[in-house]
């Protein structure tokens, strides 16, 4: 521990409620998480905080108490945040991750996914912080899986291109940084639309109406808490070994189409799935997607880094508050 700070807490005793100022320990290892109010960022923040790190999270559009509100496009604000906090590690989760939004707003997406990432890498290098840049399996075209870190990227859509350009901007500005490519994510969402996996739950539950589900693109749904654990393990290993840098892959190992995920979700909650209709044709609407961008994760596994939650277990943990008869619980427990 390197210090102590004072924090207000509420103490309840029979017939009395008191606001008490207490001293709390400050862990010596410091980590800054961008996009900490998003699905992955929340999990990364929680993982580090529960592992004896002094974690500071920042967000912008969804900023909330205990998190810094920072516009990553404001280079001066980013400079002050990093130089004031002096993190040992920065996990850069903030991004425009929706392919169709990137296609419709290319300039704004590029500013965040590329420009802000390069600037963050430069600021991290200036103080000697280890930067982990979260990238995507969409940097590959999906024609020759599984992909290792040495395979040449060839993105099919603008989202994949901005993430690849972000990788280049990070590694050009910070030779000691790490790039972590990951696939489609799910986890404890605040709303179903927060994940391309959980958003299917309403279609699964409303079995009185048939629903078309993609049965063409092969996905590897990955729990955000597993990615968060990998980020922490990578950071802790880097603090002991400066050779830990460069590009890494992490992914769940259960291959499923959206149709198969939806059926697995139905099975996990003992719901019918006969109303779900598999569509085997390549999607013609929206940004082009890779058919199978499976990531080879053996590089991290060789380092002894990794964690995988079985999809059935993870999806049940994530979605139970959104069951039609339990939605009132979201405001209380979730």
Curated annotation (Swiss-Prot):
Q: Which organism is it from?
A: Rattus norvegicus (Rat)
This protein's record includes keyword Metal-binding: no
The UniProt function text for this chain reads: Regulatory subunit of S-adenosylmethionine synthetase 2, an enzyme that catalyzes the formation of S-adenosylmethionine from methionine and ATP. Regulates MAT2A catalytic activity by changing its kinetic properties, increasing its affinity for L-methionine. Can bind NADP (in vitro).
Subunit structure, interactors included: Heterotrimer; composed of a catalytic MAT2A homodimer that binds one regulatory MAT2B chain. Heterohexamer; composed of a central, catalytic MAT2A homotetramer flanked on either side by a regulatory MAT2B chain. NADP binding increases the affinity for MAT2A.
Q: Where does NADP(+) bind?
A: 37-40, 60-62, 71-72, 93, 97, 159, 185
Listed name of the protein: Methionine adenosyltransferase 2 subunit beta
Q: Which UniProt keywords apply?
A: NADP, One-carbon metabolism, Phosphoprotein
Pathway, per Swiss-Prot/TrEMBL?
A: Amino-acid biosynthesis; S-adenosyl-L-methionine biosynthesis; S-adenosyl-L-methionine from L-methionine: step 1/1
UniProt GO MF annotations: enzyme binding; methionine adenosyltransferase regulator activity
Residues where Phosphothreonine is found: 309
Instruction: Please give the family membership noted in the entry.
Output: Belongs to the dTDP-4-dehydrorhamnose reductase family. MAT2B subfamily.
Q: Which GO terms describe its biological process?
A: one-carbon metabolic process; S-adenosylmethionine biosynthetic process
Q: Where is this region: Required for interaction with MAT2A?
A: 319-334
GO CC, sorted alphabetically, is:
methionine adenosyltransferase complex; nucleus
